[in-house]
Design a protein with these regions (language model features):
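Short, high-confidence coil segments that cap the C-terminus of an alpha-helix
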Residues: 75-78
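A conserved beta-strand-loop-helix scaffold within acyl/acetyltransferase catalytic domains
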Residues: 11-16, 27-41, 103
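Conserved acetyl-CoA-binding loop of GNAT-fold acetyltransferases
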Residues: 95-105
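C-terminal "cap" of GNAT-fold acetyltransferases
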Residues: 107-118
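Conserved acetyl-CoA binding element of GNAT-fold acetyltransferases
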Residues: 37-55
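Conserved beta-strand-loop-alpha-helix junction that forms the acyl-donor binding cleft
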Residues: 81-91
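Conserved acetyl-CoA-binding loop-helix of GNAT-fold acetyltransferases
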Residues: 55-71, 96
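Short amphipathic alpha-helix that is part of the acyltransferase structural core
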Residues: 1-15
Length: 118
């Protein structure tokens, strides 16, 4: 898996976008939008392609993704806040990293993670 910073499909409310890829497959996107109530904050929205949704189980993958998200967010003067719940069962990446599901529909399910200003 690799995470690439892109500027594709950005609206004026978008701070930055990260593409998640496995080889040539597009696994999903992390998009950070401006926070409606915090000028220096943002909201992360994540989209995972259906075929990859049940594969987000490794801690190393979660750590790699969050490290890259935090690194890029810091470049924009943001601080990422997320919580983790350690368990004996291999949790899915999104739940493990504190993402919340907010819109379930085919072919995508949307999740969010709050980002606060520094």
């Amino acid at each position: 898996m690799r995470v690439i910073r892109t500027n594709l499909n950005l609206s004026e409310d978008v701070i930055f976008n990260l593409s998640i890829r496995k080889g040539r497959d597009d696994v999903g996107n992390l998009t950070v939008y401006k926070h409606p109530e915090d000028e220096k904050g943002g909201q992360v929205h994540i989209e995972i392609a259906p075929k990859w949704r049940n594969r987000w189980v490794s801690r190393s993958l979660r750590d790699d993704l969050m490290d890259k998200l935090i690194s890029v967010a810091k470049g924009f003067g943001l601080k990422v806040l997320y919580s983790t719940a350690f368990t004996d069962v291999s949790p899915r990446l999104l739940e493990f990293a504190g993402f919340s599901e907010y819109n379930v529909r085919e072919p995508k399910t949307y999740y969010y993670l709050m980002i606060d200003g520094v």
